[in-house]
């Protein structure tokens, strides 16, 4: 497997400085959300082609790949103006990502944490937004990767499969698989069976995996953990990777730079 990180876990840096830092830390690649990670860029509206060229050159020089350009948008929001902004921003980022040499543009399908009823109500809005973004992805031949999250419109395996079938374009619609964002009931879920079900159903669509770990504190509060010290069970995911996609990118999220070495070692053992 190739090992990467969500780069803004290291804070904001200059373009050249970040590329050098990631190489020194031992990563093969990174997920870049440009306004969150570069000192030169504070919003998506700030991005210029000169930035994109600098990023491409700096990361090529340091031999750090960009498997994901992060552009996480509120695609399912019932507010039309919010959705319009999400769609137009993603379309623009598809162009930037292609120029930058990124593998995919990654997004979730909402911002807020939704109730079960809200997830269902937001689904039609999500699909409308997604179909419009996919028109641009197809036009410029660039991949969009959507990330299922159990508290968003793209919440469950059934919804994910329905979305894949409706778009019907595996060349341009891909998935980011984040196991921790799919584990709604960790206390009662047979993780081995659950991951096998997901991977058997949509594994061919997965381009990247996000890797993180956590525990549940008081009132089930989410508490990030070092890899291997929380409730995630990666054995079946690891087996599937070796059998099916041994060259896939594993991107560490919620990285604590102080424990980067241990987390990188964990991912290399997967």
Task: Describe the function of each predicted region.
Residues 3-7, 30-32, 66-71, 105-107, ...:
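Hydrophobic faces of well-ordered beta-strands that scaffold small-molecule active sites
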Residues 9-11, 34-36, 73-75, 109-113, ...:
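Active-site-proximal loop/turn and secondary-structure-junction residues that shape catalytic pockets
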Residues 12-22, 85-94, 191-199:
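Short, acidic/polar
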Residues 16-17, 53-54, 58-65, 75-177:
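Active-site acidic/histidine proton-transfer and metal-coordination neighborhood
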Residues 18-35, 101:
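Catalytic domains of carbohydrate-active enzymes, especially glycoside hydrolases
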Residues 22, 30, 59, 86, ...:
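Conserved, mostly hydrophobic/aromatic
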Residues 30, 121, 131-231:
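Acidic/histidine-rich catalytic cores of soluble enzymes
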Residues 33-55:
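Glycine-rich, proline-tolerant flexible connector loops at the mouths of alpha/beta enzymes
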């Amino acid at each position: 497997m190739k090992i990467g990180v969500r780069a803004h876990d290291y804070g904001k840096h200059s373009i050249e400085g970040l590329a050098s830092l990631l190489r020194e830390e031992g990563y093969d690649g990174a997920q870049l959300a440009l306004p969150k990670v570069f000192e030169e860029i504070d919003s998506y509206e700030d991005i210029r082609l000169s930035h994109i060229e600098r990023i491409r050159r700096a990361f090529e020089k340091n031999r750090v790949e960009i498997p994901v350009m992060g552009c996480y948008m509120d695609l399912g929001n019932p507010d039309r103006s919010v959705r319009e902004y999400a769609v137009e921003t993603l379309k623009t980022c598809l162009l930037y990502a292609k120029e930058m040499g990124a593998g995919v543009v990654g997004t979730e399908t909402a911002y807020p944490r939704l109730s079960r009823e809200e997830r269902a109500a937001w689904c039609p809005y999500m699909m409308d937004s997604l179909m419009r973004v996919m028109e641009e992805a197809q036009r410029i031949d660039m991949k969009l990767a959507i990330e299922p999250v159990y508290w968003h419109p793209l919440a469950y395996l059934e919804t994910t499969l329905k979305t894949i079938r409706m778009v019907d374009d595996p060349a341009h619609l891909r998935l980011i698989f984040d196991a921790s964002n799919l584990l709604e009931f960790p206390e009662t879920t047979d993780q081995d069976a659950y991951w096998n079900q997901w991977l058997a159903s949509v594994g061919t669509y997965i381009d990247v995996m996000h890797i993180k770990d956590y525990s549940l504190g008081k009132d089930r509060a989410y508490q990030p953990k070092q890899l291997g010290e929380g409730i995630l069970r990666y054995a079946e995911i690891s087996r599937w990777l070796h059998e099916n996609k041994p060259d896939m990118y594993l991107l560490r999220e919620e990285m604590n730079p102080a424990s980067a070495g241990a987390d990188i070692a964990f991912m290399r053992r997967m």
